[in-house]
């Protein structure tokens, strides 16, 4: 389909407009990324489900790509909690069922780029579990947006799966940073940990800080 095709333009507009309508009035959202290929019995899927459940119990909405694997685990955890929204932003793919049934709100996107934007537009943090090219694409776009000040202040990026991610983090620290491709502050954007209690504590503190600042702003106004 050509980019000047009116159908193409309409579908792009639909993606953004429907995404905004679905998410703009929701607060306390975090996004979870990870492979669609991960089995639900895998340790990382189990961890993702537990973390999503615990965060949802605190009233924190969980956003995922709405697919299988880690995405399903994240939605499943939030859905089981029944204390927050379990949001799935999936993509139309040929010959493949790309959605999971554990969502309270969902949207099917036409294009990857609009879906990727909406996955984090209304989020305050992202938690990245092991994944392939798609997960890496999502993670590095978020890091780039955070690095360049396009995300909300204090946006957090967590990598869960120390053994899986450690060589990537080493590359960032030992190759990108020493050659001047990134700054020291850019390294600090990433938290590598398997401690989900730490993530829960950090995110809760961040969202509580947001709430306090919003209340102060209301008083000043």
Regions found by a protein language model. Give the residues of each.
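Solvent-exposed alpha-helices and their adjacent loops that cap or buttress functional pockets
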Residues: 22-25, 79-81, 98-101, 118-121, ...
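Active-site/ligand-binding-proximal alpha/beta "capping" segment
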Residues: 110-160, 207-211
């Amino acid at each position: 389909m050509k980019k000047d095709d009116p159908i193409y333009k309409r579908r792009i507009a639909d993606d953004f407009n429907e995404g905004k309508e679905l998410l703009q009035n929701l607060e306390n959202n975090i996004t979870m990324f990870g492979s669609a290929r991960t089995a639900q019995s895998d340790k990382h899927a189990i961890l993702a489900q537990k973390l999503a459940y615990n965060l949802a119990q605190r009233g924190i909405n969980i956003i995922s790509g709405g697919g299988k694997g880690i995405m399903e685990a994240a939605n499943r955890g939030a859905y089981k909690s029944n204390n927050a929204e379990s949001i799935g932003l999936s993509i139309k793919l040929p010959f493949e069922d790309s959605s999971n049934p554990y969502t309270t709100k969902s949207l099917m996107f036409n294009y990857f780029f609009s879906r990727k934007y909406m996955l984090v537009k209304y989020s305050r943090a992202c938690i990245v579990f092991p994944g392939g090219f798609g997960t890496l694409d999502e993670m590095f776009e978020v890091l780039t947006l955070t690095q360049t000040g396009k995300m909300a202040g204090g946006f957090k990026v967590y990598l869960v799966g120390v053994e899986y991610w450690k060589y990537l983090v080493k590359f960032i620290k030992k190759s990108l940073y020493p050659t001047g491709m990134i700054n020291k502050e850019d390294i600090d954007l990433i938290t590598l940990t398997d401690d989900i209690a730490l993530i829960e504590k950090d995110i809760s503190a961040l969202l509580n800080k947001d709430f306090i600042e919003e209340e102060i702003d209301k008083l000043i106004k």
